[in-house]
Amino acid sequence: FPVPSIRKLYATKPLSYVANLLGHEGPGSLFTALKAKGWAENLSAGSGMVRDAEGTFEISIGLTPTGLDHIESIGEMVFDAIRQVRVHGIEAWRYAEQKQLAKMQFRFQEAVEPITLARALAARWHEYPLEDLLYAGYRYDELVKAQVIGYLSRMTPENLHLLLVAPGQETDQVDRWYGVRYRLTQLPEAWVAAWRAPSHVTALSLPVMNPFVPNDFSLRESLDTTLHPVRIVIEPGFDLWFDHDLEFGLPHSSLYFSIRSSQARGNAHQSVLTELYIALVNDTLSELTYPAFLAGVG
C-alpha cells in the first residue's frame, strides 16, 4: 500500500503499531488462520520503502501451492484483519505493551563492536535528530489514534499494489535492466468488490494481553560465587547442572535440555525421522510460543 512517509513520526510509530497487530502469529492471527487452511507458510507485515515524502506498507505472505489457488479468499481475510484492527484494535493497552517491549529491547540489547555502532549511527543521522540516534528505533511516546487511523485508511483494495511471484505465470513484458519477465494487469473487479466489504472471518481475532511481558527487572541476590557449573540433581538417567552469572547482571536465564536416545540417531533413517519430528513439534508449538518470543523468551 502506498502511504505517507513514516519518517517524521518515529516518536509515535503508528505504522509499527499496525504492523505488530497484522503480523502477529499467535492464536487468532491472520497467519494462524491461513496456516490452518494450508494456504500459507509464513507472513510478515511492516514498512517497506521509506522516503522523505512517501513510503509503503507491505504484507508479505509465503503461499503454499494450495494457497496460490485461493488468492481472492486470502485477500478477503487480509482485509477483514485490517478491518478488525481499525474497528477494535486501537487501544492504549496494546500500545503500552509494544512500548514496554521496545524499552526492554533497548535496555538489555547486547553490545556490538564500536565500528558497527559507528556505522549504524552515521546512517541514522540522515533520518533522526542527533539526540535521538540511539533511541529512535525504540521510542514509543504515546498512542495517537488519528495517526493510526490515517494509515489504516490507506489500506484499501483501491490503493493496493498486489505483487505475485510464482512459477508458471503468464508474462508479456521484459525488464530492461535485469531481463525479468513480468505482466501488469488490473485486479479483477470481483476481487476488489469482495475485499471492499470482506466477510467476517470467525477464525480471526486480535491478540490478547501478552502474559510474558515483564515489569519487574530486579535481580535476586545470590551468595553463590562459584565460577563453574555445579551439578545440583543426580538421578538415574538425569543430571541437572546450574551456573550462576556473576558478570553481566542481566535479568536473563538460559535453559538447555539434552535428551539422548540410541533410537534417535542410531542410523540415517532414524536421524531423518528425528529431524522431521523436531520440525513438526516446533511448527505445532509456534502459535503458543509466539507471545513468549515477542517478550524475548526463547
Question: Where do the model's predicted regions map?
Answer:
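Mature, solvent-exposed C-terminal subdomains and processed small-chain segments of exported/organellar
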Residues: 1-298
